[in-house]
Amino acid sequence: MKSTQTPSGMPIHKYRPFHEQIAVDLPDRTWPARRITEAPRWCAVDLRDGNQALIDPMSPERKRIMFDLLVRMGYKEIEVGFPSASQTDFDFVRSLIEEGAIPDDVTIQVLTQAREHLIARTYESLRGAKQAIVHLYNSTSVLQREVVFRTDKQGIIDIALEGARLCKRYEETIPEVDVYYEYSPESYTGTELEFAAEICNRVVEVLEPTPERKVILNLPATVEMATPNVYADSIEWMCRHLDRRDEVIVSLHPHNDRGTAVAAAELGYLAGADRIEGCLFGNGERTGNVDLVALGINLFTQGIDPQIDFSDLDGIKRTAEHCNQLAVPERSPWAGDLVYTAFSGSHQDAIKKGFEAMAADAAAQGVTVDEIPWAVPYLPVDPQDLGRSYEAVIRVNSQSGKGGVAYLLKADHSLDLPRRLQIEFSGVVQAKTDAEGGEIPSAQIWSIFQDEYLPAPLDRVEEKWGRFELTSTRTSSDMGGSVSLEVELRDGDRVREASASGNGPIAAFLKVLADQGVDVRLLDYVEHALSASGDALAASYVELEVEGVRLWGVGIDEDSSTASLEAIVSGVNRAIRRTVREPELAAV
């Protein structure tokens, strides 16, 4: 098939490919052959990078709620602010320290530019802390050097080195604090790799790390400028060109301008990084920082402990939405309201069969479903592991099929419909969705099912219907196996008593109906208990041919024999209703 696409007419002449701006050449890359086997060190920057991107920055109260959430989840390095940039951030850092809010195993991180009065204020904010990371940065990219700072490479190096020296000097003013260092060549992705390595190596020399007290070198995609593999190549190249690699923690800080921050973080980690900075649900400047929730649960679904607790994901989401005053989109990876929901009929059928197969496998092994590997089509994670229920997994609209409808009836009402009945009832539901549009919730599906198969009082169905109603039954059997059936049967406005014999209650009842002038042939019969308890209701499903019409009936009763007879009544009444309705529809 020949493509019919045509040029867009957009001004592509204004833009240069990344490879024409920054050379990243690593033909002997090794990262594609590696596998992730353990979680990286995480640093949550919601309170600094995330907060500065909010239309309405967090109040001190919301900041504290966010900090406490991050601690509960298990983050051990948390960037809590830019204390020299605002009194609000300074006061928040002080409140965490003075109120004893920082657990002993959690290290706060504070950001500062490489200017003396800002560095002095930063160290002042840290007095009394047990330990802290001072995060020093200055911008290094070609564009920033030329447009913002109007200086050369040496000028940028001088800024970084002076900042590092000042940090070491002011460290002496807070001897009670165990100070660690992080340096970021901001706008790293727009910086020549040779220059990025040079400035990082020079800063490391000033900060004097050891293998026991490493310095963090953070290599941010401040603006995402290329595909994730290019970022990974640059990280592997940097790891090879750091003079004191064994004294350095290589950290990643991807932004999501091109929509590939998660991939960039994962590939950069493969390429040799040790640590990743990001925000819950990808909050942050422009299109956001890398999503720590997506990264963590990605690991979890590969059988790797993220070392972060996502077991109450909806609670995490609610808290983040409150603090950020931003909604988490419905399709946000792992956390959105619709990410475990299937509307498509084929997807629903596969999910239903997946649940059934897992239950069967677990039963065969004599274990619970939670003790065997998760394997359900279209659900790469068990929603219950993240605190979700199965209620929203399958939802029904005009795109849905028999699998979704059958799943909801089984999940919510314990009805395990035979396959041909699933097909029949899904057609009934499809007619509703086509006529009314939108989604049909489980409660409405149950109402439709009752109206179609289980004639009931008017407060439970759309309309009272059905020629026949079974009001009482009595059976007896002789030693020869013959069953005698006596029934009280409402036929329209009259109540009749009738009796017949057969090789079982069903056969006898079919004779009763034949005596009433109704020709019924039984094609299939299935029954099951609605629960495992001794007083469980029984559900019976019968496939009938009534006056040449083939359809199903359903009966539910405490007695399985009565349920089977009610199922026959259901099928007969449906056949009669169909013959009444078809002329009405033809006349419309």
Curated annotation (Swiss-Prot):
Q: Does the keyword Cell division apply?
A: no
Q: Where is this region: Regulatory domain?
A: 456-588
Grouped into one coarse class, the protein's main location is cytoplasm
Pathways involved:
Amino-acid biosynthesis; L-leucine biosynthesis; L-leucine from 3-methyl-2-oxobutanoate: step 1/4
What superkingdom heads the lineage? Bacteria
Q: Please name the GO terms that the record assigns under molecular function.
A: 2-isopropylmalate synthase activity; acetyl-CoA C-acetyltransferase activity; magnesium ion binding
Reaction(s) this enzyme catalyzes, per UniProt: 3-methyl-2-oxobutanoate + acetyl-CoA + H2O = (2S)-2-isopropylmalate + CoA + H(+)
Q: Does the keyword Transferase apply?
A: yes
Keywords attached to this Swiss-Prot or TrEMBL record, sorted alphabetically, are:
Amino-acid biosynthesis, Branched-chain amino acid biosynthesis, Cytoplasm, Leucine biosynthesis, Magnesium, Metal-binding, Transferase
PANTHER family, alphabetically? 2-ISOPROPYLMALATE SYNTHASE, PTHR46911
Regarding protein family, the annotation reads: Belongs to the alpha-IPM synthase/homocitrate synthase family. LeuA type 2 subfamily.
Record's function text: Catalyzes the condensation of the acetyl group of acetyl-CoA with 3-methyl-2-oxobutanoate (2-ketoisovalerate) to form 3-carboxy-3-hydroxy-4-methylpentanoate (2-isopropylmalate).
Cite the record's note on assembly: Homodimer.
Q: What is this protein called?
A: 2-isopropylmalate synthase
Organism whose genome encodes this protein: Clavibacter michiganensis subsp. michiganensis (strain NCPPB 382)
Ranked from the top, the taxonomy reads: Bacteria, Bacillati, Actinomycetota, Actinomycetes, Micrococcales
